[in-house]
């Protein structure tokens, strides 16, 4: 019997899973919240711009160096039976390191410099740089832009590199390598300085056939091409291939066999497709957490406006993987729950339930359209299909009779409407959606939300019984690289997570939600396209 380790680095915590390669059984698991969390608002007592979201890379290593030995000690598994390790990571989470692969923030002279720290995926400090890239690409009629949704996100790697070069050249000068944090973890485990085709292809303007888009970089900044060539370029390893084995030093430190094979990192949401078994084209998967990623597989490559990229073989060999997303979903629900009136909080405490359970109970008693509310779910900007991090959320239709559960339900509906915008975008560009999957802690716990999604999308929703699909997907990659399975299909079918429940659309509610969606779409187009300057001007005052 053999085992694989899946290491999942999420936004707020890291998880280590030991999984049976024959049947996907979770033998052991370890979860650790990052000690420094997400660094927002201030850094070491110094105020940060509102758009900043940073992390400390030492927290990531703490997850590995504590988690793996603890699991091995608790399970008594022979390390020689662990054939592979897979890693998934949020993206684009970018790290800047010196020539010893030490994060720049560990250098004492950069301790208070925010640009020496890891730039988390939701760091939006590079919007000006993203705009410059986009405008230059439009002027140059750059052919690649269509494969990135005809836009450039401040969340991607190249704008973040430009931001550091512009605002902290002293950090850039001493930086030896720039990479996705997932690639850095692979380096720490193996000693190999490589790049995953998944991270580069989706977030870094790199194509397998042509490499980086240096023709564009040259037009944007005189130094950008040189920075990418000397600090980003490295050998590429594709998903399904092996980077190598765990280094002797790390094997000794973690208690692993030096023969354990390591997979290249995969983006966390993408790993979920493997974990839930969505391996075919025409299937849309919603990976729902603090944000939501909407992933599609297709045999062909299409230029779909508003998506975040399309890369061949980034999840499943020979299939193009497409990514779109919403930047605030779980975060948005938590925001609304935190605004709950005192009497609601007190009632929940007295009944021994969470505030979310109380709000869901109350919201479920309301009928679609009953409150007269429509919300725009842009509290953290809009990733798809508008690709504008400067946009802000809105709530329309408030009256003196509006209750807090009405607001809560309106925001749940808004995230469903945002998902429908994305689904229609896929469908409008020759990508049929036949099945819809949902995974993550939110759909597992919130049946009402999935009912709303089924009725808004007018699709059956299949919810997977797993809060940790990314970790299982990473373990599947470890099993493939370690030789436990001959191919992707074999590994996925053996190790995937089971179905928890399915929700069918209700015809009567589908009809009501069509009308509400039309209202949402009109507001979306007005404030996202035609009158977007209104929100941008207000945001500029913050």
From Swiss-Prot:
GO cellular component, one term: cytoplasm
Keywords recorded for this protein, A-Z: Arabinose catabolism, ATP-binding, Carbohydrate metabolism, Kinase, Nucleotide-binding, Transferase
Record's catalysed reaction(s): D-ribulose + ATP = D-ribulose 5-phosphate + ADP + H(+); L-ribulose + ATP = L-ribulose 5-phosphate + ADP + H(+)
GO biological process, one term: L-arabinose catabolic process to xylulose 5-phosphate
EC number: 2.7.1.16
InterPro entries xrefs: ATPase_NBD, Carb_kinase_FGGY, FGGY_C, FGGY_N, Ribulokinase
Name listed for the protein in its UniProt record: Ribulokinase 2
Organism whose genome encodes this protein: Staphylococcus saprophyticus subsp. saprophyticus (strain ATCC 15305 / DSM 20229 / NCIMB 8711 / NCTC 7292 / S-41)
Lineage: Bacteria, Bacillati, Bacillota, Bacilli, Bacillales
Gene label: araB2
